[in-house]
Amino acid sequence: MTQSLIHKFLAKPMSGVEIEKRSFDIIDSEAGPLTVPRDQWEVIRRMIHTCGDPSIAPLVRFSPDAIQAGVSALRAGAPLYVDSNMIRSGLSLARLRSVCPAYTSAMITCNVAAPDVAAESSRTSLPRSYFAVRKARATLDGGIAVFGNAPVALLEINRMIAEGEIKPALVIGLPVGFVHVEESKTELISLPVPSIIMMGRRGGSTLAVSIVHALCTVAECTQETTG
Protein backbone atom coordinates (compact mmCIF):
# COMPACT_ATOMS: atom_id res chain seq x y z
CA MET A 1 0.00 0.00 0.00
CA THR A 2 1.33 3.45 -0.97
CA GLN A 3 2.05 5.62 2.03
CA SER A 4 -0.23 8.63 2.36
CA LEU A 5 1.48 11.94 1.62
CA ILE A 6 0.48 13.29 5.03
CA HIS A 7 3.21 11.12 6.55
CA LYS A 8 5.86 12.97 4.50
CA PHE A 9 4.48 16.25 5.77
CA LEU A 10 4.47 15.06 9.37
CA ALA A 11 8.08 13.91 9.01
CA LYS A 12 9.03 17.51 8.18
CA PRO A 13 6.16 19.53 9.64
CA MET A 14 5.55 23.22 9.00
CA SER A 15 3.36 25.60 10.96
CA GLY A 16 0.62 27.60 9.30
CA VAL A 17 2.80 30.71 9.53
CA GLU A 18 5.70 28.87 7.88
CA ILE A 19 3.48 27.59 5.09
CA GLU A 20 2.19 31.09 4.41
CA LYS A 21 5.72 32.52 4.36
CA ARG A 22 6.88 29.78 1.99
CA SER A 23 3.89 30.49 -0.25
CA PHE A 24 4.78 34.17 -0.50
CA ASP A 25 8.43 33.29 -1.15
CA ILE A 26 7.31 31.15 -4.10
CA ILE A 27 5.04 33.92 -5.41
CA ASP A 28 7.86 36.48 -5.17
CA SER A 29 10.34 34.12 -6.81
CA GLU A 30 8.05 33.29 -9.72
CA ALA A 31 7.19 36.95 -10.24
CA GLY A 32 10.79 37.99 -10.80
CA PRO A 33 11.88 41.66 -10.63
CA LEU A 34 9.10 44.02 -9.54
CA THR A 35 7.45 46.09 -12.26
CA VAL A 36 5.02 47.84 -9.88
CA PRO A 37 5.53 49.82 -6.65
CA ARG A 38 6.13 47.70 -3.54
CA ASP A 39 2.82 48.68 -1.91
CA GLN A 40 0.87 47.67 -5.02
CA TRP A 41 2.76 44.39 -5.15
CA GLU A 42 1.72 43.69 -1.55
CA VAL A 43 -1.90 43.79 -2.71
CA ILE A 44 -1.30 41.76 -5.88
CA ARG A 45 0.71 39.03 -4.14
CA ARG A 46 -2.00 38.66 -1.49
CA MET A 47 -4.55 38.23 -4.28
CA ILE A 48 -2.33 35.63 -5.97
CA HIS A 49 -1.97 33.81 -2.65
CA THR A 50 -5.76 33.78 -2.29
CA CYS A 51 -6.52 32.24 -5.69
CA GLY A 52 -3.25 30.42 -6.46
CA ASP A 53 -3.03 31.99 -9.91
CA PRO A 54 -0.11 34.33 -10.76
CA SER A 55 -1.69 35.12 -14.15
CA ILE A 56 -4.06 37.59 -12.48
CA ALA A 57 -1.24 40.06 -11.76
CA PRO A 58 -1.53 42.09 -15.01
CA LEU A 59 -5.30 42.37 -14.55
CA VAL A 60 -5.12 44.36 -11.31
CA ARG A 61 -5.43 48.12 -11.76
CA PHE A 62 -4.92 50.90 -9.21
CA SER A 63 -5.89 54.54 -9.45
CA PRO A 64 -2.82 56.69 -8.68
CA ASP A 65 -3.88 57.37 -5.09
CA ALA A 66 -5.62 54.08 -4.27
CA ILE A 67 -3.14 52.58 -1.81
CA GLN A 68 -2.58 55.73 0.24
CA ALA A 69 -6.30 56.51 0.25
CA GLY A 70 -7.13 53.01 1.47
CA VAL A 71 -4.44 53.05 4.15
CA SER A 72 -5.52 56.48 5.40
CA ALA A 73 -9.18 55.43 5.50
CA LEU A 74 -8.39 52.27 7.46
CA ARG A 75 -6.25 54.18 9.95
CA ALA A 76 -9.11 56.62 10.44
CA GLY A 77 -11.56 53.78 11.07
CA ALA A 78 -13.67 54.44 7.98
CA PRO A 79 -16.79 52.24 7.79
CA LEU A 80 -16.94 49.52 5.15
CA TYR A 81 -19.85 48.68 2.87
CA VAL A 82 -19.64 45.20 1.35
CA ASP A 83 -21.87 43.76 -1.36
CA SER A 84 -22.15 40.24 0.06
CA ASN A 85 -22.34 38.62 3.46
CA MET A 86 -19.50 36.34 2.33
CA ILE A 87 -17.20 39.37 2.31
CA ARG A 88 -18.54 40.48 5.68
CA SER A 89 -17.78 37.04 7.13
CA GLY A 90 -14.36 36.89 5.49
CA LEU A 91 -13.04 40.22 6.74
CA SER A 92 -10.85 39.82 9.80
CA LEU A 93 -11.82 42.19 12.58
CA ALA A 94 -8.45 41.49 14.19
CA ARG A 95 -6.66 42.74 11.07
CA LEU A 96 -8.80 45.85 10.90
CA ARG A 97 -8.16 46.53 14.58
CA SER A 98 -4.42 46.13 14.06
CA VAL A 99 -4.68 49.32 11.99
CA CYS A 100 -7.43 51.09 13.95
CA PRO A 101 -8.49 49.65 17.34
CA ALA A 102 -11.86 51.41 17.06
CA TYR A 103 -13.18 48.96 14.45
CA THR A 104 -16.22 46.89 15.42
CA SER A 105 -18.33 44.41 13.48
CA ALA A 106 -21.08 47.04 13.28
CA MET A 107 -18.79 49.13 11.07
CA ILE A 108 -18.98 46.51 8.30
CA THR A 109 -22.36 46.85 6.58
CA CYS A 110 -24.13 44.62 4.07
CA ASN A 111 -27.74 45.35 3.14
CA VAL A 112 -28.55 42.56 0.68
CA ALA A 113 -30.57 40.62 3.26
CA ALA A 114 -32.46 43.64 4.65
CA PRO A 115 -36.25 43.10 4.53
CA ASP A 116 -36.96 46.46 2.87
CA VAL A 117 -34.32 45.73 0.22
CA ALA A 118 -35.84 42.33 -0.49
CA ALA A 119 -39.33 43.82 -0.69
CA GLU A 120 -38.28 46.55 -3.13
CA SER A 121 -36.43 44.01 -5.26
CA SER A 122 -39.53 41.82 -5.41
CA ARG A 123 -41.74 44.78 -6.29
CA THR A 124 -39.54 46.06 -9.12
CA SER A 125 -37.85 42.85 -10.33
CA LEU A 126 -34.49 44.61 -10.00
CA PRO A 127 -31.54 42.98 -8.18
CA ARG A 128 -31.40 43.30 -4.40
CA SER A 129 -27.82 44.53 -4.71
CA TYR A 130 -29.07 47.67 -6.49
CA PHE A 131 -31.34 48.69 -3.62
CA ALA A 132 -28.83 47.52 -1.01
CA VAL A 133 -26.19 49.95 -2.23
CA ARG A 134 -28.71 52.81 -2.44
CA LYS A 135 -29.63 52.15 1.19
CA ALA A 136 -25.94 52.49 2.12
CA ARG A 137 -25.39 56.10 1.00
CA ALA A 138 -24.36 57.32 4.46
CA THR A 139 -21.75 54.57 4.79
CA LEU A 140 -20.48 54.96 1.24
CA ASP A 141 -19.86 58.70 1.56
CA GLY A 142 -16.37 58.71 3.07
CA GLY A 143 -16.35 54.96 3.60
CA ILE A 144 -14.67 52.02 1.91
CA ALA A 145 -16.80 50.16 -0.64
CA VAL A 146 -15.90 46.51 -1.25
CA PHE A 147 -17.53 44.78 -4.23
CA GLY A 148 -16.78 41.16 -5.07
CA ASN A 149 -20.11 39.98 -6.34
CA ALA A 150 -22.65 42.42 -7.78
CA PRO A 151 -21.89 44.39 -10.97
CA VAL A 152 -25.26 46.17 -10.88
CA ALA A 153 -24.42 47.50 -7.43
CA LEU A 154 -21.10 48.75 -8.75
CA LEU A 155 -22.84 50.45 -11.66
CA GLU A 156 -25.11 52.24 -9.20
CA ILE A 157 -22.27 53.41 -6.97
CA ASN A 158 -20.50 54.61 -10.12
CA ARG A 159 -23.57 56.72 -10.90
CA MET A 160 -23.71 58.12 -7.39
CA ILE A 161 -20.04 59.09 -7.60
CA ALA A 162 -20.36 60.59 -11.09
CA GLU A 163 -23.42 62.63 -10.08
CA GLY A 164 -21.79 63.94 -6.90
CA GLU A 165 -24.06 62.15 -4.41
CA ILE A 166 -21.21 60.40 -2.58
CA LYS A 167 -17.43 60.43 -2.38
CA PRO A 168 -16.07 57.14 -1.02
CA ALA A 169 -12.58 56.98 0.45
CA LEU A 170 -11.88 53.91 -1.71
CA VAL A 171 -13.84 51.60 -3.99
CA ILE A 172 -12.65 48.02 -4.47
CA GLY A 173 -14.40 46.82 -7.63
CA LEU A 174 -14.11 43.08 -8.20
CA PRO A 175 -17.56 41.85 -9.26
CA VAL A 176 -17.38 38.51 -11.05
CA GLY A 177 -19.47 37.12 -13.89
CA PHE A 178 -20.58 37.71 -17.46
CA VAL A 179 -23.23 40.44 -17.45
CA HIS A 180 -22.33 44.12 -16.80
CA VAL A 181 -19.09 43.03 -15.13
CA GLU A 182 -16.37 44.37 -17.41
CA GLU A 183 -18.06 47.69 -18.12
CA SER A 184 -18.76 48.33 -14.43
CA LYS A 185 -15.04 48.05 -13.66
CA THR A 186 -13.94 50.11 -16.66
CA GLU A 187 -16.36 52.86 -15.67
CA LEU A 188 -15.16 52.84 -12.07
CA ILE A 189 -11.48 53.24 -12.92
CA SER A 190 -12.35 56.25 -15.09
CA LEU A 191 -14.03 58.11 -12.21
CA PRO A 192 -12.30 60.65 -9.92
CA VAL A 193 -12.30 58.35 -6.90
CA PRO A 194 -9.57 56.11 -5.44
CA SER A 195 -10.18 52.60 -6.73
CA ILE A 196 -8.74 49.13 -7.20
CA ILE A 197 -10.18 46.84 -9.85
CA MET A 198 -9.49 43.56 -11.62
CA MET A 199 -10.02 43.83 -15.35
CA GLY A 200 -12.18 41.30 -17.18
CA ARG A 201 -14.80 38.89 -15.89
CA ARG A 202 -12.82 37.55 -12.96
CA GLY A 203 -13.08 38.73 -9.39
CA GLY A 204 -15.02 37.47 -6.41
CA SER A 205 -15.56 37.89 -2.70
CA THR A 206 -12.38 36.16 -1.53
CA LEU A 207 -10.20 38.35 -3.75
CA ALA A 208 -11.99 41.47 -2.55
CA VAL A 209 -11.34 40.44 1.05
CA SER A 210 -7.68 39.80 0.26
CA ILE A 211 -7.29 43.40 -0.95
CA VAL A 212 -8.60 44.82 2.34
CA HIS A 213 -6.30 42.54 4.32
CA ALA A 214 -3.33 43.51 2.14
CA LEU A 215 -4.07 47.19 2.75
CA CYS A 216 -4.04 46.44 6.47
CA THR A 217 -0.57 44.91 6.04
CA VAL A 218 0.65 47.97 4.13
CA ALA A 219 -0.78 50.22 6.85
CA GLU A 220 0.98 48.25 9.59
CA CYS A 221 4.31 48.22 7.74
CA THR A 222 4.26 51.95 7.06
CA GLN A 223 3.33 52.64 10.69
CA GLU A 224 6.41 50.67 11.80
CA THR A 225 8.61 52.52 9.30
CA THR A 226 7.45 55.97 10.37
CA GLY A 227 6.88 55.18 14.03
Give each language-model segment a name.
Residues 169, 179-227:
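C-terminal functional extensions of proteins
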Residues 35-49:
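N-terminal glycine-rich anion-binding loops that anchor highly charged ligand groups
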Residues 58-75:
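A short, well-structured juxtamembrane/interface segment
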Residues 120, 126-184:
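Long, charge-patterned amphipathic alpha-helical coiled-coil/hairpin "stalk" segments used as oligomerization
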Residues 1-38:
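Charged, compositionally biased N-terminal leader segments and the immediate start
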Residues 96-140:
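Long, charge-dense
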